[in-house]
Curated annotation (Swiss-Prot):
The gene is ydiU. This is Protein nucleotidyltransferase YdiU. Pfam families: SelO. Nucleotidyltransferase involved in the post-translational modification of proteins. It can catalyze the addition of adenosine monophosphate (AMP) or uridine monophosphate (UMP) to a protein, resulting in modifications known as AMPylation and UMPylation. Belongs to the SELO family. The active site is at D249. It catalyses: L-seryl-[protein] + ATP = 3-O-(5'-adenylyl)-L-seryl-[protein] + diphosphate; L-threonyl-[protein] + ATP = 3-O-(5'-adenylyl)-L-threonyl-[protein] + diphosphate; L-tyrosyl-[protein] + ATP = O-(5'-adenylyl)-L-tyrosyl-[protein] + diphosphate; L-histidyl-[protein] + UTP = N(tele)-(5'-uridylyl)-L-histidyl-[protein] + diphosphate. Mg(2+) binds at N250, D259.
């Protein structure tokens, strides 16, 4: 049986300092446990082949396709504010696939063994975190948020030592690219301007080709990246997503969400919510995500200074001007999104106060973030704390008055709300239930059911209360771990 697949690799046209040719480590008995047939179809892949034993050999990296050059990418980054040399320490890029509509995607194996960038790690991954990334990334796709995708998860037949012995696994990740802010930091810190320019030109041609011929293309490039990240972070905030580890190596230039280690979705609304066990100071808490994205982008701007203008002072001024746009862009995207969540079509002077008042009540009465907007969409109040609140009723009256002043009908307002207020999200306790069944009992039914529901989060005709129910009080204090 033949895979009938051709992988390109344009990344190796960059100077050799940006990567190392690296074969994945062979594993004893690769077994496919999760296959994303929908994504496979989008990529034009033969599901029959890849679900076969031979297909598992290819997906695990045990068998390398002809005429391909697997690589590990070099990059640096600020991790919790501290700069360090990094790189793909447990991942190998098999190559790039070009779809029928001329879209180019990286095919990367995560958990594929040691590389020159492993820094003492074993280069391996375990089953739970890889399945978790599969669930969350597909959940983000369903929510309409730009994200890397998960094509497959395989067990390797290995036992990996972490706090305990765990089953080894490999995730097959699909991304528009894996070029990170940290890739530009690496070029600026360790290479010459010539190599930095080569990286910038390659990235522009791959992701922002419409600006390549423009004068001041590097300024235009920085502007587009800032705008895309402002939009992305607004989308995160609007659904209560907390990434957990917004280091510069986890911000990709394409504008996709990447690296789902310690991420989680907020249940009870509170701006200071943080889930990651390693984020002890709350650096990447929910309310800090816009600020930290701006900080990361400032590091990109610093790296691009040699390209922005021959005069360093002028280049720094340009960089600062573009970074200063982030806050305005973010707030524009966020307020636009919040108005939609409230069924409001057009901007009004009272909207900011209306939105802030609702969020304040949600904090005061410990309301569930997702279900508050779900209830508003359904014209109901299911949360006990809000149900008996005179303050909340007063807010509802103000909101209804605001909606009635629109030219658009109430029916159109409800349709708008249904299109942006999910009935379900990847609730942390439901994700953990699915992972426990899969990892401990080899039972993937709960995971399959969860992923199926998450693919249609805005389906108000077929709501599933089981997946919409917040955790009980005993599930509070949820903590996430990066799984590295």
């Amino acid at each position: 049986m033949s895979p009938n697949i051709s992988l390109d690799n344009t990344y190796i046209t960059l100077p050799e300092e940006f990567y190392t040719e690296q074969l994945p480590s062979k594993v004893p008995s690769p077994k496919l446990v999760k296959w994303n047939s929908t994504l496979a179809k989008e990529l034009g892949l033969d599901s029959d082949f890849f679900q076969s034993e031979e297909g598992a050999l290819v997906l695990s990296g045990n068998q390398i396709l002809e005429d391909t050059t697997p690589i590990a990418e070099a990059y640096a980054g600020h991790q919790f504010g501290y700069f360090t040399m990094l790189g793909d320490g447990r991942a190998v890029l098999l190559g790039e696939i070009v779809t029928n509509d001329e879209e180019r995607y990286d095919i990367q194996l995560k958990g594929s063994g040691r590389t020159p960038y492993s820094r003492g790690g074993d280069g391996k991954a375990t089953l739970g975190p890889m399945l978790r990334e599969y669930i969350i990334s597909e959940g983000m796709k369903g929510l309409g948020i730009p994200s890397t995708r998960s094509l497959a998860v395989l067990t390797t037949g290995e036992t990996i030592l972490r706090e305990t012995a765990l089953p080894g696994a490999i995730l097959v990740r699909v991304a528009k690219s894996h070029i990170r802010v940290g890739t530009f930091q690496f070029a600026n810190q360790f290479l010459d301007t010539k190599e930095l320019k080569a990286l910038a030109d390659y990235t522009i041609k791959r992701h922002y080709k419409e600006i390549f011929t423009k004068e001041d293309r590097y300024r235009h490039f920085l502007h587009e990246v800032v705008k895309n990240q402002a939009r992305l972070i607004a989308q995160w905030q609007l659904v209560g997503f907390i990434h957990g580890v917004m280091n510069t190596d986890n911000m990709v230039i394409s504008g996709e969400t990447i690296d789902y280690g310690p991420c989680a979705f907020m249940d009870t609304y509170h701006p200071e919510t943080v889930f990651s066990s390693i984020d002890t100071e709350g650096r990447y808490a929910y309310q800090n995500q816009p600020k930290m994205a701006s900080w990361d982008l400032a590091r990109l701007a610093e790296a691009l200074v040699p390209l922005l203008n021959d005069n360093t002072e002028k280049a720094i001024e340009i960089a600062q001007e573009e970074i200063n746009q982030f806050s305005k862009l973010y707030l524009t995207f966020w307020y636009e999104g919040m108005r939609k969540k409230l069924g409001l079509f057009h901007e009004n002077d009272m909207d900011e106060d209306l939105i802030e008042a609702l969020l304040g009540l949600m904090v005061k009465y410990e309301a569930d973030y997702t279900n508050t907007f779900r209830d508003l969409t359904l014209n109901q109040t299911t949360q006990p704390n809000l149900k008996g609140s005179a303050e909340y009723q007063q807010w509802l009256d103000l909101w209804q008055d605001r909606r009635k002043k629109q030219e658009e009908s109430l029916e159109d307002s409800i349709k708008l709300m249904e299109s942006v207020n999910p009935t379900v999200i990847p609730r942390n306790h439901r994700v953990e239930e699915a992972l426990e069944r899969a990892v401990n009992y080899h039972d993937y039914n709960a995971m399959d059911s969860l992923v199926s529901v998450l693919q249609h989060p805005y389906d108000y005709k077929n709501q599933n209360d089981y997946y919409a129910t917040p955790p009980g009080k005993t599930a509070c204090g949820y903590r996430t771990f990066c799984g590295t």
